[in-house]
Amino acid sequence: MPHFRLCFSRANCRKKGNSGKHTNPLLPYGYIKDPKDITKLYVDEELRPVVELIYKLYTEEGIGRKKICDILNSKYNYPTPSVYYQMKHLERGRIYKHPVQKLWSTYMIRNILENDVYCGTLRTHKKKTVSIRGKAIKLPEEEHFVFENHHEAIISKDTFNLAQEIRKRKLNT
């Protein structure tokens, strides 16, 4: 099976997702695939400090997403998700066809802060495609398949929950 194809059919992909296997070819920032089993996630030790720093700045120091972007862009030399994926593609001799954003954005920070994959949870079946070439529709959270303690966490569940509380508080003010 080619390493870039995780599922050959929608039914096969759904079956793997139902059984707790990671089926998305794009990995969450901070994780790598197991070379022997591409459906398993492992922490990328090179990127662990970036994710930890983002959560620390947001939860412990009370810094907002925009300020976190400014800090990452000026003080640290951490690659953005798209720059990192491009580097990994080039290392393997492949072409990265997606647009590359060299500076951190609030959107990237939000994606990291809102994704429970960082506390060891795998969530599958988040979207559904209605027709063959149709647009994917987001499904309600009740329909997601959730696998707690699926892989090694970068941050604790408590830290993740605190980040969600802070986010909700900021939305309500």
Give a label for each model feature.
Residues 1-173:
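Conserved catalytic breakage-reunion loop centered on the nucleophilic residue
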